[in-house]
């Protein structure tokens, strides 16, 4: 695990799975109401600069996709460990620039900064944020979205 939080999640997962439960690992759920997105939009709309990590990957999901999957797990009375993720990663800087363009703001207001492990509570910067969904795609007949599709769905 890359952080204390991740270590605690792993321990919790073991307890749940050892008791016949269900664990669904999610990557990052994003919406227009996500605090970071709202903050960036407000600042960019006010012609103010924002900082975005250029070395930190994100694997965005939208809430509708997550809810659809949870319903399928319930309907099949499934047990065990499942993962939800888009097919590909995107960097925070790319989301910020995309948002700037979407709201007709100046992309030059987006500053590229490097995430430092200590500042984000990690032991190291992860190379990838995606999770393998091969089993979930087969077992539940779902299509893993691309990050671009997720961002389009949430209006970014």
What are the residue ranges of the model-derived segments?
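N-terminal Rossmann-like NAD(P)+-binding domain of SDR-like oxidoreductases, especially those catalyzing
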Residues: 1-4, 12, 18-19
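Hydrophobic/aromatic beta-strand patches that form the interior of the parallel beta-sheet core
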Residues: 5, 22-24, 82, 111
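Short, amphipathic alpha-helical "lid/cap" segments that border enzyme active or binding sites
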Residues: 37-41, 63-74, 144-155
């Amino acid at each position: 695990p890359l952080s204390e939080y991740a270590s605690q999640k792993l321990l919790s997962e073991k307890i749940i799975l050892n008791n016949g439960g269900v664990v669904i690992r999610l990557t990052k759920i994003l919406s227009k109401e996500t605090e970071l997105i709202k903050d960036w939009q407000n600042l960019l709309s006010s012609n103010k600069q924002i900082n975005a990590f250029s070395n930190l990957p994100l694997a965005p999901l939208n809430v509708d996709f997550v809810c659809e999957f949870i319903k399928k797990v319930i309907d099949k009375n499934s047990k065990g460990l499942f993962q939800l993720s888009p097919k590909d990663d995107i960097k925070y800087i790319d989301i910020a620039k995309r948002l700037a363009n979407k709201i007709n703001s100046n992309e030059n207001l987006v500053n590229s900064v490097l995430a430092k492990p200590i500042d984000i509570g990690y032991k190291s910067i992860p190379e990838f944020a995606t999770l393998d969904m091969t089993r979930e795609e087969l077992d539940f007949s779902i299509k893993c979205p691309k990050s671009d599709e997720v961002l389009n769905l949430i209006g970014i």
